[in-house]
Amino acid sequence: MAAEMALVKPITPKFINPMRTFSSSSKFSTIKMSATSQSNTTTTATKPSKKGNKKEINETLLTPRFYTTDFDEMETLFNTEINKKLNQSEFEALLQEFKTDYNQTHFVRNKEFKEAADKMQGPLRQIFVEFLERSCTAEFSGFLLYKELGRRLKKTNPVVAEIFSLMSRDEARHAGFLNKGLSDFNYALDLGFLTKARKYTFFKPKFIFYATYLSEKIGYWRYITIYRHLKENPEYQCYPIFKYFENWCQDENRHGDFFSALMKAQPQFLNDWKAKLWARFFCLSVYVTMYLNDCQRTAFYEGIGLDTKEFDMHVIIETNRTTARIFPAVLDVENPEFKRKLDRMVVINQKLQAVGETEDNSVVKNLKRVPLIAALVSEILAAYLMPPIESGSVDFAEFEPKLVY
């Protein structure tokens, strides 16, 4: 069964940004969009939509990525003829959950969306477009991966295949809803162009399990935390998409539960020293990426009344507690030194960004980057080598999910 979810902590006053108005200070005017209108691209780009400007993504290390895997190995792992001990009953129970489709009628828009978008002006409007764009890209990435897994596993394990197909349904629904949101701002992501043009990152199946489990669970905690914060502080409810996060996050949670079941079905991914090292590596990768990403976009979180770093640490801690129920080892993220290391990484990353924005030639820029990259790697390695927390359970004790809204 899925791991029992820890209760989210009440949002404390320090969690909320004390600024009650969104000022147009100079730091907001320098924010750069990670997408550019198609009209600025080469002639190979897709024609602009009649409804608005199509957008394509500029790649950076922190951009949401598209993943692929060894589908042949995945077929072997879940082949019911080869692996007689697979816990098919758990997969069948999960399948019924997905078939119920709790959110089938949830993602219905109303006139509030366009009205809110029209009221949003200045830097906050620009930042919000970027938020929708990045979120849509991440959801669409999940759709493509799950769809292909559903197709490839049909013959070897129809139950697992159908769950992947139903998860791709959820991700497509999320991506479409977010893209509709972009249309409120007179933009749209060209998802067909993205499918063909984006670079795909290859991960072996066990790494897909680690990374995707963390991605889904951290998504749950991000969405539910934002939802609860805005429910308590409605004056920051600048766009109605946040009102959908309570039900939306349960899709993320169910997806994470499924990946938990997949890992339990392959105990070799969880019960040796190598699994402990990889588990810590993926925890650190996901947490650092989120922290650096969000600290580049503090204006967005300030715009909805959140303190970016407090919000991120809250999400990291809750995700880590949840992850500890399945991963054999996790990071000690509640050690104050862990946050200090993250904050030092933010400072180094800001310096790296500043180097990239100078007018120096590429050789000079690269020379300036070398000591900064070395310092960043040193901080990441030091965080990885902090004493971990032994966790998980090799006998996979079953936990009943207890979700509190």
From Swiss-Prot:
Entry protein name: Magnesium-protoporphyrin IX monomethyl ester [oxidative] cyclase, chloroplastic
Recorded catalytic activity of this chain's protein: Mg-protoporphyrin IX 13-monomethyl ester + 3 NADPH + 3 O2 + 2 H(+) = 3,8-divinyl protochlorophyllide a + 3 NADP(+) + 5 H2O
Subcellular location: Plastid, Chloroplast
SS bond list: none
Transit peptide: 1-44
Organism: Euphorbia esula (Leafy spurge)
Region of interest called Disordered, as start-end residue ranges on this chain: 33-54
UniProt family annotation: Belongs to the AcsF family.
Main location: plastid
